Curated annotation (Swiss-Prot):
Subcellular location: Membrane; Endoplasmic reticulum; Endoplasmic reticulum-Golgi intermediate compartment
Lineage start: Eukaryota, Metazoa, Chordata, Craniata, Vertebrata
Topology in membrane: Multi-pass membrane protein
Disulfide-bonded cysteines: none
Transmembrane annotation, as ranges: 5-25, 57-77, 118-138
One Gene Ontology cellular component annotation held by this UniProt entry: endoplasmic reticulum-Golgi intermediate compartment
Encoding gene (name): CNIH4
Highest taxon, organism lineage: Eukaryota
Any one GO BP annotation for this protein: endoplasmic reticulum to Golgi vesicle-mediated transport
Record key words, sorted: Endoplasmic reticulum, ER-Golgi transport, Membrane, Protein transport, Transmembrane, Transmembrane helix, Transport
Main function: Involved in G protein-coupled receptors (GPCRs) trafficking from the endoplasmic reticulum to the cell surface; it promotes the exit of GPCRs from the early secretory pathway, likely through interaction with the COPII machinery.
Natural source organism: Homo sapiens (Human)
Assembly, per entry: Interacts with Sec23/24 complex components SEC24B and SEC24D. Interacts with CCR5. Interacts with ADRB2 in the early secretory pathway.
Record family assignment: Belongs to the cornichon family.
Protein name: Protein cornichon homolog 4
GO MF assignments: CCR5 chemokine receptor binding; signaling receptor binding
């Protein structure tokens, strides 16, 4: 059972890594004016809920399988994703709003957040890979 948890976590982490890279590429395209703010934000807002669900499922799965250290490592990022989604003002298009993305350095903060998430998911990828190999050897 432990190996199945880490295989699923590893696959989910791969998807989240690709999603983080997609966020970085799309935000850098907006920064360089290759795409407009409306199309950038609509592309990114499509993937906010799948990212939220994917990370939350892995976090809950780690809690249920009693992997406390990895659960506690994932908990702040999952909490931040939920908080960011809940705190979207009612008039905004989503987490990424085209009317406000160039205001108050939001583009830079979104880019920094995407980079931090990419580093976090890469760290988790190798942790899950190590744990999966260890679980397969012990079975």
């Amino acid at each position: 059972m432990e190996a199945v948890v880490f295989v699923f976590s590893l696959l989910d982490c791969c998807a989240l890594i690709f999603l983080s890279v997609y966020f970085i590429i799309t935000l850098s395209d907006l920064e360089c004016d290759y795409i407009n703010a409306r199309s950038c934000c609509s592309k990114l807002n499509k993937w906010v809920i799948p990212e939220l669900i994917g990370h939350t499922i892995v976090t809950v799965l780690l809690l249920m399988s009693l992997h406390w250290f990895i659960f506690l490592l994932n908990l702040p990022v999952a909490t931040w994703n939920i908080y960011r989604y809940i705190m979207v003002p009612s008039g905004n298009m989503g987490v990424f709003d085209p009317t406000e993305i160039h205001n108050r350095g939001q583009l830079k903060s979104h880019m920094k957040e995407a980079m931090i998430k990419l580093g976090f998911h890469l760290l988790c990828f190798f942790m899950y890979l190590y744990s999966m190999i260890l679980a397969l050897i012990n079975d």
